């Protein structure tokens, strides 16, 4: 009997033994086509020869050095690379997972306010229908009813405003611009009610990932939100743990929104899953307030700026740049959306297909005309996943798409290296899975 604690405590997962490109292989030799990079992680696929070579080279050089005493060329170079592409952020720190860097963002937001002599600026505002991590801090700002439910009593208080979810919430008599303005006014009002002297930061996923299924904001939304934050001296912190590092066709998803936040968190795709590594980038204003204040970052963890993880992430980023993969992500993304629309056009339960780059969501409804959220909930998501697995297809379904408990979606996040032929196979097989599962 296994000694491993699994997510599903009563069933064993499949034993994975290998992978190559967009394919994963189990112990019985069955191959699975990966439409979702696991959970938007494997952007370069499996067994990439350059990454394998980098492991051998770097592991022979230096495994680990404590960040309290040492820095490394890899950490310096990776930070410079990420900062230089950020459009205005100044410093980066590396941790192991998305929750950790989002928790760090919360701590730095408060440390910054406090060291400026504004310790009352301590309230965090986030959006409903969002996910920012599994620690108690990050879960408290996650507008994800399902993931919060067990731990509700333990969570510190946080405030929430509406998501930017045009498919469901933009009114028929409203333009995208008016919708964005209405949401910015809602945030403005929320801050006024709480008192801007009490609010530290506003958090948002640039493109909402697992909770809603690849939902980008309407054009102009983030510019208006940023203006509200600036007006009230509130930090704007973007969570791109899932959407960042090329997934939308830009290194940072906010490039499409025409803004630069005060902080951004990235994770999953940073080392394409070859290493557990994440990063938080912050502005010079925030860094210098702390540097000239206490001079000490109020957070310490064992694997800060892990040398080997940074070196592998750097090689991953180098491959993405040299192979011009972001352009490919944009092109394949358009193909994916248009092929999905074509192949699912006759299914009335497919309500919306949206996203950016290779970050695409399919939302299910009871009927296209009414947009009534699909009734299937968790059972439908599980059935889709099971059917797909049987057919050798890895998909990432979710439920609670609309208002936290209702509705279903599937998130596509295939590796950046996916060929046209492989993309076509993903769409074809997915269409067959949807048709095979009772609805
Ligand atoms: C947007 C977002 N933020 C934070 C996290 C947490 O990251 P991790 O699971 O690596 O801790 C996730 C994970 O799915 C995420 O999608």
Question: Which residues does each predicted region cover?
Answer:
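Conserved N-terminal phosphate-binding loop of PLP-dependent enzymes in the Aspartate aminotransferase
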Residues: 1-439
């Amino acid at each position: 009997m296994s000694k491993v604690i699994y997510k599903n405590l009563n069933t064993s997962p499949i034993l994975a033994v290998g992978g190559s490109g967009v394919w994963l292989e189990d112990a019985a030799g069955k191959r699975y086509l990966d439409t979702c990079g696991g959970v938007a992680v494997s952007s370069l696929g499996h067994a990439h020869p350059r990454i394998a070579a980098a492991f051998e080279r770097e592991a022979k050089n230096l495994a680990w050095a404590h960040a309290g005493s040492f820095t490394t060329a890899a950490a310096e170079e990776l930070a410079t690379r990420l900062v230089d592409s950020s459009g205005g952020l100044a410093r980066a720190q590396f941790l192991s997972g998305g929750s950790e860097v989002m928790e760090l963002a919360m701590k730095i937001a408060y440390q910054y306010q406090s060291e400026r002599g504004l310790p009352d600026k301590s309230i965090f505002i986030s959006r409903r229908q969002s996910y920012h991590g599994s620690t108690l801090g990050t879960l408290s700002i996650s507008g994800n009813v399902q993931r919060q439910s067990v731990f509700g009593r333990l969570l510190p208080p946080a405030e929430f405003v509406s998501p930017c979810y045009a498919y469901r919430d933009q009114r028929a008599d409203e333009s995208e611009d008016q919708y964005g303005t209405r949401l910015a006014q809602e945030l403005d009002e929320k801050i006024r009610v709480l008192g801007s002297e009490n609010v530290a930061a506003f958090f948002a996923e640039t493109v909402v990932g697992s909770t809603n299924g690849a939902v980008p904001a309407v054009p102009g939304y983030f510019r208006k939100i940023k203006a509200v934050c600036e007006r009230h001296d509130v930090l704007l912190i973007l969570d791109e743990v899932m959407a960042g590092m090329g997934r939308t066709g830009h290194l940072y998803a906010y490039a499409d929104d025409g803004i630069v936040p005060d902080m951004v968190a990235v994770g999953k795709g940073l080392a394409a899953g070859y290493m557990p590594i994440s990063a938080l980038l912050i502005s010079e204003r925030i860094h210098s307030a702390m540097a000239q204040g206490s001079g000490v970052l109020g957070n310490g963890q064992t694997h800060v700026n892990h040398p080997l993880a940074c070196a592998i992430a750097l090689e991953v980023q180098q491959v993405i740049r040299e192979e011009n993969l972001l352009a490919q992500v944009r092109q394949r993304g358009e193909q994916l959306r248009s092929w999905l629309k074509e192949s699912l056009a006759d299914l009335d339960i497919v309500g919306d297909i949206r996203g950016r780059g290779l970050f695409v969501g399919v939302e299910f409804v009871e009927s296209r005309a009414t947009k009534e959220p699909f009734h299937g909930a968790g059972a439908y998501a599980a059935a889709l996943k099971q059917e797909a697995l049987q057919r050798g297809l890895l998909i990432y379904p979710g439920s609670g798409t609309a208002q936290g408990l209702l509705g279903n979606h599937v998130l596509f996040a295939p590796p950046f290296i996916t060929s046209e032929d492989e993309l076509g196979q993903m769409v074809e097989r997915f269409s067959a899975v949807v048709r095979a599962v009772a609805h």
